[in-house]
Structure formats: structure tokens, C-alpha cells
Regions:
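Short, solvent-exposed beta-strand edge segments and adjacent coil->beta transition regions
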Residues: 129, 214-218, 272-274
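Contiguous C-terminal substrate-recognition/catalytic subdomains in enzyme active sites
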Residues: 62, 172-261
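N-terminal Rossmann-like NAD(P) cofactor-binding subdomain of oxidoreductases
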Residues: 1-179, 197-199, 267-269
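Short C-terminal domain-edge/linker segments immediately following a structured domain
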Residues: 35-37, 59-65, 101-104, 164, ...
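C-terminal active-site/capping subdomain that shapes the small-molecule cofactor and substrate pocket
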Residues: 220-311
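Predominant activation on well-ordered alpha-helical scaffold segments within soluble catalytic domains
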Residues: 18, 143-147, 184-188, 192, ...
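Short, surface-exposed acidic/glycine-rich loop or hinge patches that mediate macromolecular interfaces
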Residues: 11, 136, 209, 224, ...
């Protein structure tokens, strides 16, 4: 069994990781670290776990007795602080959901980390990687929408990204980002690994949706390539990836809710190529991809623990 621990144990990301790992056949959860909630039952904070586990939060981190650590605190600086205050044993696999090391993992050849979007980076994850820096939720949707174009050197015009995502603390329709976005650097970095010539302008409009989970994005740009040719590029790029699907109808949030799926739809209205994409930002955009990455790092079948569940 893989012995797993979670830091940042009271976060929504930790809750979703726990919900997946509790039913994962190859994982034993040995520690959920949250000093601020020490001694409390997990279910007192994460109400969806009532009756599923009787574990309690702890301030301890048995770092020498675990195989994988999920760092679930997404506040900037949280993972850097953890790494600076703990002696990490060689061989411990770390899956980091914070933004702290994303750009380093993309831009620094000496970095021990892998930018862990599973679709383009499966090989380094299965070939001995010990640190994985998970993409942000918007990047988790936008990159699958654009990577097949980058691979074929087709990102040569301004890219417009209109997205609506769950944001419980904001009013529906409230702007979250206009023109610029905090995940722009990692999106550009990941695209640049496939298309070194990529320097196109990227313009963002991101608003809050009136729901708890889910991110829907429309990405559009000018393109001279026919939609049939583009569909072939996408089908080829994702042909051996279990969770990213190219659909012939517009994706809905209902299709992806509670799943690790990313559904993409392509259409053309010359000269515009329009790409619609939908994910569950708490699962595919965070916890589900983190477990997917763990499966790859430990040589498991990538769908283990992530199959569609009844509700």
C-alpha cells in the first residue's frame, strides 16, 4: 500500500483529495496535517466525510514514514514555507497544489519538479519524478484546449480566453480577471515547451459563476486551418489519454461535475477557431489530477480511484 499524507488538511482541495483516496484501493491515508484543527475529526471540517472516516487532524507530519505527500494548501508561499521547515527524505514523492514552484518546474532545467499537467508530461512522471507541481484550475482547462495547436506550431495570433468558474465568495457574474490573469505565466511556459516561437498576446475575461464546482471556458483565435484538420490534430494528441475527450457537441458542466474529465469541443466560423472546454475545477483542476499524477508516479493504471462514481 502507498502511505499518503496531506498537508493543508482543512482546505477544499484536501477535502476532495480525501474523498478520492478513501476509496483508492492502493492507498492508506496515514496523516492529515492541520495544526489549526489538531484533534478534530476530519468530518467536523469536511462534512461530506461523515461516516466515511474517523481520522483526526494532527499537527504532526511523519515525513520519514510516508511514500507520498499531497501539499493541499494553495495559498502562495505555503509550500515554500513547508519545504523550508522540513527535511524531506530522498525518494519521497511530493504533489504540490500551490503555485509556488509552477514556473520553476517549467523554466528551470535544474528543478527537481515536473509541471504536472498529465497530458503532455506523462513520461517524466512515470520515469522517476519525485516532485510534481500541479497546474492552476484555469491552466488545467486552457492548456488542453491549446496544446495540440502548440504542438503543431499553430499558435500565431491573439488568443482570447473567456471563462466562468466557481467562486463561492463572489457574486455570479462578478469579474475575477480582466485582460491579465495570475496563471498567465504558467500557461505561456507550458505552451512554449511545445512551440518555442509562441509569443502571442493572451487576453483573459474570467467571471464568477453561480455554482460550487466547475469551470467553462471559450478560447478563440484566428486560424486558417480547417476545423476538420484541427479535429484530427486534437484526436491524435489525446488518443491515449483517458480523461481528456474531444466531443461533437458543446460540453456542459453537468457532464464533468465530480469527475476528472476535460471535455473539448471545436468549431470554426472563419476566420475564427472557437474552442469550448469544461472541467470540474475542484477535481480535474486540482484533486483529481493530483491523484492521477500519483498513479503515474507509482506506476499504477492511471484511472485507478478515478472511475465515474454513482451519486
Amino acid at each position: 500500500m502507498i502511505k499518503a499524507a496531506i498537508s493543508g488538511g482543512t482546505t477544499p482541495q484536501a477535502r476532495e483529495i480525501l474523498k478520492i483516496l478513501i476509496n483508492h484501493p492502493d492507498v492508506e491515508i496515514v496523516c492529515v496535517n492541520a495544526p489549526e484543527a489538531e484533534g478534530m475529526l476530519l468530518s467536523q471540517v469536511h462534512r461530506g466525510l461523515r461516516g466515511e472516516t474517523f481520522m483526526r487532524f494532527t499537527s504532526q507530519m511523519p515525513i520519514d514514514d510516508i511514500d507520498v505527500l499531497f501539499m493541499a494548501d494553495t495559498e502562495p508561499g505555503a509550500s515554500m514555507k513547508f519545504m523550508a521547515t522540513h527535511s524531506v527524505p530522498e525518494g519521497l514523492k511530493i504533489i504540490d497544489l500551490s503555485p509556488d514552484f509552477r514556473e520553476e518546474s517549467l523554466n528551470d532545467a535544474e528543478s527537481p519538479g515536473v509541471y504536472a499537467l498529465p497530458e503532455p508530461h506523462r513520461k517524466p512522471l512515470v520515469r522517476g519524478a519525485t516532485r510534481a507541481s500541479m497546474p492552476g484550475p484555469l491552466a488545467s482547462a486552457v492548456l488542453p484546449a491549446l496544446l495540440p495547436l502548440a504542438k503543431n506550431l499553430l499558435l500565431n495570433s491573439t488568443i482570447h480566453i473567456n471563462a466562468v468558474q466557481a467562486e463561492p465568495q463572489a457574486e455570479p457574474g462578478e469579474p475575477l480577471a480582466l485582460l491579465e490573469h495570475e496563471e498567465d505565466a504558467e500557461i505561456r511556459g507550458a505552451l512554449g515547451t511545445l512551440q518555442a516561437s509562441f509569443h502571442s498576446e493572451m487576453l483573459y475575461v474570467v467571471t464568477a459563476g453561480g455554482w460550487q464546482n466547475g469551470l467553462a471556458a471559450t478560447v478563440y483565435m484566428e486560424s486558417a486551418v480547417s476545423v476538420n484538420e484541427i479535429e484530427k490534430l486534437y484526436e491524435e494528441f489525446f488518443s491515449d489519454h483517458s480523461f481528456t475527450l474531444v466531443a461533437d457537441t458543446l460540453p456542459t458542466l453537468m457532464e464533468v461535475a465530480g469527475t476528472n474529465k476535460c471535455i473539448i469541443h471545436l468549431q470554426k466560423s472563419d476566420p475564427w477557431l472557437v474552442i469550448n472546454v469544461a472541467i470540474d475545477d475542484k477535481i480535474k483542476g486540482a484533486a483529481g489530477s493530483a491523484v492521477h499524477v500519483m498513479n503515474l508516479m507509482f506506476g499504477l493504471q492511471e484511472r485507478v480511484g478515478l472511475m465515474l462514481k454513482s451519486h
